[in-house]
Design a protein with these regions (language model features):
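Extended ligand-binding regions for polar small-molecule ligands
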Residues: 298-321, 388
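Hinge/lid segment of periplasmic solute-binding proteins
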Residues: 98-154, 275-278
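Short helices/loops that flank or line small-molecule/ion binding pockets
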Residues: 75-87, 91, 95, 99-105, ...
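Conserved N-terminal structural module of periplasmic/extracytoplasmic solute-binding proteins
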Residues: 2, 10-13, 18, 24-100, ...
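Extracytoplasmic/periplasmic substrate-binding proteins
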Residues: 228-303, 309
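Helix-loop-helix "hinge/cap" segment bordering the ligand-binding cleft or interdomain interface
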Residues: 118-119, 135-240, 299-305, 386-389
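Long, aromatic- and glycine/proline-rich binding clefts that accommodate carbohydrate-like moieties
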Residues: 324-379
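Loop/turn elements at helix/coil->beta-strand transitions in domains of secreted/extracellular proteins
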Residues: 40-43, 63, 86-89, 142, ...
Length: 407
């Protein structure tokens, strides 16, 4: 059995390497047929805020489409060309702010609604994707981009401590911590109030704001429980170095799931059946997707069929099955990746259940809304303001902000 597992992993790694080389434009085109005498229609692909290694194939559909990639680097020059009417056929971009790249916001009139492409397609449908993903990425009922891979941000606890993980609130975790001698801390020292609040800001943008109606609703028990959860961390600042507590002595562990293989090793790592509890909402718990490379079709694209063919190629089960820098966004490919990773049936079930608990998505931040939430919480965290007063302040400031920005 050991050698069978090793050989399966070698084969998977080899296939993954082939796909990576193809994605970099260094291998043979997506189709292995000889090029036709006529050059296919050109698809101009702009790569913005993304490294060259993410470049995709150089031709598609037996050379029906010839792909030309342009590396824009920073987004300012690209936006200037776009607004001047010089749009590419497709844009590849980093959907999540990362390092020096701020991320590109495509939720505007310059880009097509990709639901129209999905709904008209004969092989790809909304149900092809991971549960809740498209809804989480949508704004005002429109889907302006798709992503190639995702991570899932969540919290994990042991079943012996939390049962099935349903219906938990911050007060429940405090009670479990007090009743169980094994656990010395709710979090390890790397999980600070501010790092938790960053995640709450991501959740809040989807859960408590309505851009279409320029409104928000932070005055609810769900948002209060999230702020309580942040304040339950005893750590105000991140301390570089090793955690004060052993892995076995912390009740909740933060996980950023970016590989199906992680589901294989988790039972051994936790020494008990792991439970994906997410962020507390008094129900199933909530987790969120972190979007990686994004694809968007400009409204002024001159080759929209070719642009959609490019996206479909990158989202095919064959290409998705061996995504190495995250989790596949196509459900069938995700399930196959679990099988390829020798994940147990029980953990496969838990992984699929986690998808149902993953309700939101991080893409491009609303920096103004985040600033309102983080600034308003400082007095609550240092003990000079009550939770109710803090929520009132956030609701008041955010209401004005939403009206001004989206009204």
């Amino acid at each position: 059995m050991f050698w069978v597992m090793i050989m399966k992993k070698i084969v998977s790694a080899a296939l993954a390497l082939c796909l990576i080389l193809s994605a970099c434009g260094e291998a043979a085109p997506a189709e292995t047929q000889e090029p036709s005498e006529e050059v296919g229609s050109v698809v101009k692909v702009a790569c913005v805020c993304a490294q060259p290694s993410v470049f995709g194939p150089t031709s598609l559909n037996g050379y029906e489409y010839q792909i030309t990639h342009y590396d824009y680097g920073e987004q300012e020059r690209y936006i200037a060309d776009l607004t001047a009417g010089d749009a590419p056929d497709l844009v590849l971009f980093r959907a999540r702010p990362f390092g020096e790249y701020p991320g590109l916001d495509v939720n505007n009139e310059y880009y097509d609604d990709l639901y129209e492409y999905i709904d008209a397609d004969d092989t790809l449908s909304r149900e092809s994707f991971l549960p809740n993903l498209l809804e989480a990425m949508s704004r005002g009922g429109e889907l302006k981009f798709l992503c190639r891979q995702v991570e899932i941000a969540t919290f994990v606890a042991r079943e012996s401590a939390v049962g099935d993980g349903y219906g938990l609130l911050p007060s429940d975790y405090e009670r479990i911590l007090a009743e169980n001698e094994r656990y010395l801390s709710l979090f390890d020292t790397f999980v600070t109030k501010s790092s938790l609040l960053d995640s709450v800001c991501i959740i809040s943008e989807s859960a408590f704001t309505d851009r279409e109606n320029a409104s928000c609703d932070f005055d609810n028990d769900y948002f209060r429980s999230l702020l309580e959860f942040c304040n339950s961390s005893p750590y105000d600042e991140y301390v570089d170095g090793q955690s004060t507590y052993d892995f076995d002595n912390t009740l909740l562990k933060r996980e950023y799931l970016s590989s199906a293989l992680r589901f294989n090793v988790m039972p051994g790592v936790y020494g008990d059946d792991p439970v994906f509890v997410g962020f507390p909402d008094g129900d199933m718990g909530c987790s969120y997707y972190i979007c990686g490379l994004g694809y968007a079709i400009p409204a002024q694209s001159s080759n929209k069929e070719g642009a959609w063919a490019y996206i479909k190629h990158m989202l095919s089960v064959e290409a998705q099955r061996y995504v190495t820098a995250g989790l596949p966004v196509i459900l069938e490919a995700f399930e196959l990746a679990l099988e390829d990773g020798d994940v147990s049936e029980e953990m496969q079930y838990k992984a699929l259940e986690l998808l149902e608990r993953t309700k939101y998505a991080e893409s491009v931040h609303d920096a103004g809304l985040k600033e309102i939430i983080t600034d308003s919480c400082q007095n609550y965290f240092d003990g000079t303001a009550t939770l109710d007063d803090t929520v009132d302040i956030i609701q008041s400031r955010a209401s004005v902000y939403m009206s001004e920005q989206y009204g």
